[in-house]
Each structure stands twice: as C-alpha cells, then as structure tokens.
C-alpha cells in the first residue's frame, strides 16, 4: 500500500472505534458478550471517551425485535487535537447481533455484523473524505454460577476510503468479576493483526434496575484511553 494512504487508513481506524466498537459491547468494555436484550427490550446508551488527543461522544440505541436477535444504531462525533485545527470525525453505524445459543451458566455463542460510515474533515488542509467500514465478529461467553464471566471475540474489519481498502483481523478477551451485588470489575485485552494489544480495566455499577454507570481506563500502542458511560435498559 502506498505510504500516502497510511494517514487515511489510520483515520478510518479512529472512526471505526467511535462508530461501532461498543455498539453492542456493554460499557465500559470494548470486548462484546454473547448475549442479547430480551425480546421486546430496548436500551439507550451514551459514552464519552478519550483516546490519545482525540475526544468524542457516542450515542447508541438498541432493541430486540426477535428472540436472540438485537439491532443497534449508533451516532458518534469526535475531534482529534493532534492537529491544529482539530480533525473532525462524524460517524453513523448500524449492526445486527445474533446469539442463537444463550445460557445463564456455561457457554453462549453468537456473532455480530456492523456497518459504518465516517465523514472525516481536516480543516488544516482542508480536505474531506468518506470512509466505509464493515465488521464481522464471532462471540463466545462463559458464565459461572458465582457471577464470573469470560468473553472471547474473533473477527475482521474491512475499511474502504478514497478507492483504497484494507482488511484486518481483530480479537479480544474480557473478564467480569463481581465485587458486590450491583458492582462489577471489568478487565480486557484486545487488538488487531500487526499491532500490539490494548489493555483496559474498569467498573460498572447498577444504580437502579436497568440503569448503569461505568468507567474505564486503558493503555496500548503508545497512547492512553478512557471512557465514561451511562446506560438504560428497559
């Protein structure tokens, strides 16, 4: 791939993180679980995140029209202050999550399919371009009777912009540990082919039934990142 395309594909990766990385994953985790909302259930989630010098917010609406199936729609806005003036990212995404095997204890298995579109505006140049992303992910979750949970993800993401395209393999592993009745510790490691992994640790607290607040911090690939989230399931 020519060197002059590297910044474009790097920008695509940032846009992908904002539009879809957490559309189905329960905050504050990036690694997804093999589970869906109950049929007829809905959720609204808002997340503020920081990654290096980029800051942004993501809003997600999810619902389950059928048993074992969840639909997600997301909108994200981000500014990368590594440049002056900042580069702006505006993203929208939609996805499907199907988990045909779901168990309260033991193994559950499923898959997700996400589509995204990111508009990148560089006011310093100025230049504008559109990026398109398609991601597929295999999910496996082990739930223990004591509440400990392990999540495994394996998939691939295809990025296309300015006539160039690239496909990268992705992976992730996450763990949830109950600290109290309504409080969980989360830990995860995730990444993509040809890059070093990212690692994060966080907390999720259920304030009242269906309403959760969360936060996480992490580091990897020579930058730190973090997020704060609020979710309502009903």
Segments from the language model and where they lie:
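Hydrophobic helical h-region of N-terminal Sec-dependent signal peptides
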Residues: 12-18
């Amino acid at each position: 791939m020519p060197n002059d395309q590297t910044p474009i594909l790097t920008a695509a990766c940032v846009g992908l993180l904002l539009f879809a990385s957490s559309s189905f994953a329960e905050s504050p985790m990036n690694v997804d679980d093999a589970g869906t909302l109950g049929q007829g259930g809905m959720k609204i989630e808002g997340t503020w995140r920081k990654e290096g010098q980029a800051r942004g917010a993501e809003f997600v609406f999810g619902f389950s029209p059928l048993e074992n199936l969840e639909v997600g729609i997301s909108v994200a806005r981000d500014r990368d202050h590594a440049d002056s003036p900042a580069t702006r990212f505006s993203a929208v995404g939609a996805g499907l999550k199907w988990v045909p095997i779901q168990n309260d204890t033991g193994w559950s298995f499923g898959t997700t399919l996400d589509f995204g579109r990111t508009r990148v505006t560089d006011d310093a140049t100025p230049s504008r371009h559109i990026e398109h992303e398609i991601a597929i992910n295999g999910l496996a979750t082990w739930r223990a009777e004591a509440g400990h949970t392990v999540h495994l993800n394996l998939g691939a993401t295809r990025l296309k912009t300015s006539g160039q395209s690239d496909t990268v393999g992705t992976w992730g592993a996450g763990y949830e540990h109950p600290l109290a009745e309504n409080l969980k510790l989360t830990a995860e490691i995730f990444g993509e082919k040809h890059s070093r992994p990212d690692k994060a640790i966080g907390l999720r607290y259920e304030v009242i039934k269906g309403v959760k607040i969360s936060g996480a911090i992490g580091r990897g690939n020579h930058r730190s990142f973090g997020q704060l989230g609020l979710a309502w399931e009903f």
